[in-house]
Amino acid sequence: MLQPKRTKFRKQHKGRIHGEAKGGFLLNFGGFGLKATEPERVTARQIEAARRAITRHMKRQGRVWIRIFPDTPVTSKPTEVRMGKGKGSVDFWAAKVKPGRIMFEIDGVSETIAREALRLGAMKLPITTRIVVREDW
């Protein structure tokens, strides 16, 4: 699964996801893409599940690009532990996704296969998405 090799700090504040994507909102690599329409944290497991669903439907044809990276550590405390005594340990890694962000791009397959593959990948994600085609702009 995806996670940073090293970070400057082990833990981060939760923060909030404000506004729309300032970058990464155009198709740069493939002809079809999956665009987020709402703000949410997407975990490394969810990204990997979506990638597997997309590549499985494409039957190893074409190419898939993952345009988001889980670089935010999410901490949690063990069950039945009282509040206080410091912040919990890192549980998983997540990517903060803003509306308008392209998350996946694919190329090298027909439009029907591409749309179905992206639809299957979108089912694995916790946010609503749109399928965009390069001819849209």
UniProtKB/Swiss-Prot annotation:
Pfam families: Ribosomal_L16. SUPFAM superfamilies: Ribosomal protein L16p/L10e (SSF54686). One of its GO terms (biological process) is translation. The keyword Signal does not apply. CDD domains: Ribosomal_L16_L10e. GO terms for cellular component: cytosolic large ribosomal subunit. Gene3D superfamilies: Ribosomal protein L10e/L16. Part of the 50S ribosomal subunit. Binds 23S rRNA and is also seen to make contacts with the A and possibly P site tRNAs. HAMAP family: Ribosomal_uL16. Belongs to the universal ribosomal protein uL16 family. This is Large ribosomal subunit protein uL16.
